[in-house]
Amino acid sequence: EVHKTDFNAIETDDPSLLFRFFDGFFLYAFILSWAKDDLLDWFQPKTRDTSKRDFNWLDTMWRRTLISSNSERMIGKLFSISVNIPAFLERFPDAKLLYMIREPLNVIPSGLSLVTGVLDGVFGFWNLPVEKRQFYIDRLYNALIELQLRFHDDWINDRIDKNKVMIVKYDKMMLNFEG
């Protein structure tokens, strides 16, 4: 197994957007990918920008965490902001991001495994008919590619302040995890 996870596992801050607003990339990844019509476009900031609402919620949640833990620094783990990093950095000007890159031939199967692992644990995903599984996997595959393409487009077109983002290569990190 690539990932050991379940529906109750605490993985990132991203699920809080799903549970707070019944919206966000997790809504698409876990639920709307099954829809007859492909609804991925709903999660394009150019089509429907929820970043102000989402960032306000993250700010509230993070402030509560800082107060309750008597801390001064918040370290979040988010992957969905890759669709709109310029807006995130505008809303959180003191933020510093680590953006992990990985060979697409490895990251896509890893992302698919993470989500289908949760779905299998809750709903028995791998027991569904092959056609239903493939329909879902195709949709999720395209969504995961879209996340990478959006970051890349913002990066090469200088919409991301490169002084606030450090790109970390997954393979290099795994070779020297302690260093």
Language model features: what each stretch is:
Residues 1-74:
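PAPS-dependent sulfation machinery
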